[in-house]
Each structure stands twice: as structure tokens, then as C-alpha cells.
UniProtKB/Swiss-Prot annotation:
Gene3D superfamilies: 2.40.30.130, Threonyl-trna Synthetase, Chain A, domain 2. One of its GO terms (molecular function) is Ser-tRNA(Ala) deacylase activity. This is Putative alanyl-tRNA editing protein alaX. It comes from Saccharomyces cerevisiae (strain ATCC 204508 / S288c) (Baker's yeast). Binds 1 zinc ion per subunit. One of its GO terms (biological process) is aminoacyl-tRNA metabolism involved in translational fidelity. It comes from the Eukaryota. InterPro entries: Alanyl-tRNA_Editing_Enzymes, Thr/Ala-tRNA-synth_IIc_edit, Transl_B-barrel_sf, tRNA_SAD. One of its GO terms (cellular component) is cytoplasm. Pfam families: tRNA_SAD.
Amino acid sequence: MPTPMTPVKVGALACQRNSFLFDGFKTLVVSCEPTKNKKGEIEGYEIELQDTILFPEGGGQPSDSGFLKIVEGNRNSSKIEKILVSHVSRFGLHAKHHVNDYIEPGTTVEVAVDEQKRMDYMQQHTGQHLLSAILERNYKVDTVSWSMGGIITKKKPVLEPSDYFNYIELNRKLTLDEITNVSDEINQLIINFPQEIIVEERIGEETVDEVSTSKIPDDYDLSKGVLRTIHIGDIDSNPCCGTHLKCTSQIGSILILSNQSAVRGSNSRLYFMCGKRVSLYAKSVNKILLDSKNLLSCSETQISEKITRQTKQIQQLNKREQYWIKRLARTASEELMNTLKASGKKRAYFMEEEYGTLELLLQIHKEVSNFLKDDTEGYEIILCGYERQTNTGSLLILSESGEKIANLAANLGSILQNLKGGGGKKGGKWQGKITSISNAEFAALSDYLSHDFASC
């Protein structure tokens, strides 16, 4: 047994000995070390406890999150404080709890785990063991790796319903019949023939000939640690450090998708989810179906047909729009060139006040460029588009002179507060975007183009 200030090794943690211990667990703080960012500033602390019911990330299972309640130590013991543990990481045989507050080593804390998250993770993880075991036993299909879905990250703080699916990578693609049969058998083992799940622990150099240790992490010293083997009835025996259910009935249900993704040659990813996720997924998908029915004014079975029909209509409308954009651009460019020639001032502008998209302005620029390519004399052209529905706009300034472009951009910038753009330092094209425009600014812009700019 470890001494009071000697931490229990990963493999024999309280969360691994009893995965249903969710709160009320008291232990000691062994160490509390600061973590620093790239600037050397303290951004948090890593705490190692004498023992813990918070599982450190490993075995394809994310870490738990939870709280530490200070019950005595360097703070007022009469006031219990809750400190959030955002995640727990493993360093060799040690579990490190990531927190924002310093806790004095020797302090007694009470640990609580996020029970809902733990149960969800166990349902997915135990479900994966059972799924892989059935595939290997019945079809000789090997699980190469697996990944748990439904994990919120900084890169993806909001998850789509499909993000909650886990996947196992297999050494070949399954047929639809195989997926159906596997689903039926697993649901039988959940509902009608539940299997007891037992965790066997071996310490140090005990013989483990019947269990492969090839997937034990390289940084886990098995000679000093604990080898945990998860037995699901007589169906499966596999080494695993994760937390698991006590019986297959606790998996609740399993949903396996028929669509698979090809990866690494002939390998395939099979997507599945277990337990409460299945009902939550059904609710979210049902809402999407109801919303789609209402928006499309059709029944569920007609949604696909309706979307296909509308997609074709949109494609046809896009083709028509492109045709008329080119026609309008050609006409506008001819008018611009006529204005340049007639005025003798080499200044002209175009303004569209309703559907003045950047696409239209760029097409006009393309047409105008064909006229200007052989013109060596000076010119200044402003193309302005306003989209009334979004209250945004676009601007192009064309000139052979970078100085002229800069002057015009400055003038327009003094009128339009939210105009930003660039380019044309050596002549050519300056392109800008107006993120929003007031009525007063729009009136001032119109006045500038028709009077100040055109009459100079």
C-alpha cells in the first residue's frame, strides 16, 4: 500500500478500481506545479493527488472533468471551495489534474466527477469493446484503431449531430448484411443476454501470455505499473486502462451507420454510437426533419426529391444570373468607355444601387480592361455596388496611376467610414469592401460621384 503522500499509480487509481464512484472521495494533494505559456507566464497548475476518481486521458477515452472541494489545508476549512478540473493527463504512471488555482500540498480535498460525462464515455468505450469483439469473432475483421466522438475542442466548440458518432477503423469494409447482423447481435447481448464485465488486474511482471500487450503505451512502465484486462463474459478479453460498465445491459443501445469511409487503402471506418447518445441523436435528427418538412412544405419521404428539384432550379437560376451579369457588364463597360471618350476628362463611374455585387463589378472590370489595354493615356474609373438587402457594398478604383488610385481611395474613405481595401499601388485596380453604410453616407457617396468626381 502507498504511504499517505505517495501517489497511486495509473492502472490502480480509484476510478479504475470502481468506475461508478462519482463523488465523496477524499484524498490528499501530493504536488501542485505551475504550468506556463510560451511567454513564461503562469496559466494554471498541475495537481497530483494521492488517489483520484478522475480518469486521465488514455486508451482512446478522453479524460474526466470534475471538481476538487477543499475541506482543510491552506485555506479556510470552514468554507468549502470548488475548483474546476478541466482535464486530467497521464505522465507515465502519474495522473495530473489541470486547474486554475494553487492548492498547497498536504491539503485534503474531496473529488467529484462529472457523472453524466463519465457514463457517456463508459457506454461508448464498452460498446466499442463489444463491437470489435463481435466483428473479430464472427467475421475475422480486425479493429486497427478507434476514436470517440462527441468531444468539444477549442477548434470545434459547437458540435453537429453527426460529430457524436465514434468510429472504429477496420481492415476491410463491411457489407450491409454484416452491419445488420452485428447490430442485431449486440442489441441481443444488451437486452436479452447481458454479459457481466469483469476487470482483472496484474501487477509487475506477472505472466500475461493469453493477453496481447502490444497496445500498451511506450511511456507506461508495465514492470512498475498495473495491467488491466477487461473481460466481457466469454466474448472478449482485452487490456485497457479505461473506465468500463459492469454489464453489457448498461450500454443501453447501439446505432451503427451503414455508410463507411475508406481510409488507408482497403481499410474502412465504421461509425457507431451507444447509450443515451442514440436517443439524443434521434431527437436532434427528428427536429431537423420537422424543420425541413415545414420549410419545404412536404412529407418526410419527399424531402430528398424536393431538395433535388430545388437544387436543379437554383443551378438554372445561377446560369441565368451569370448570363445577365455578363450582358449588363458588357453594356456598362461600353457606356463607361463612351463617357471617357466624350468627356475628354478620362473620368467615369458606374453605380448599381440594388444588387451591386462584387461579382458584377469584377465582370465590368474584366470588360473594361479589354478596352483599356491599348490606352496609354491617363484614366480614372470608379465602380461602386450597393446591396440594399445586406446594407453592404463593394468598390473598385481603376487607373494607370498608383497616385491617382491612392487619392481617390482617400476621398472615398473620408465619406465611407466602414470602407476597407487595398491594391493598385503601381496602378491597375484597388478593391474595397463596405461592411455597412448609413443613408447619409450613401447620399454623400452619390453626390461625390455625380458632382465632385465627374466634374473635376
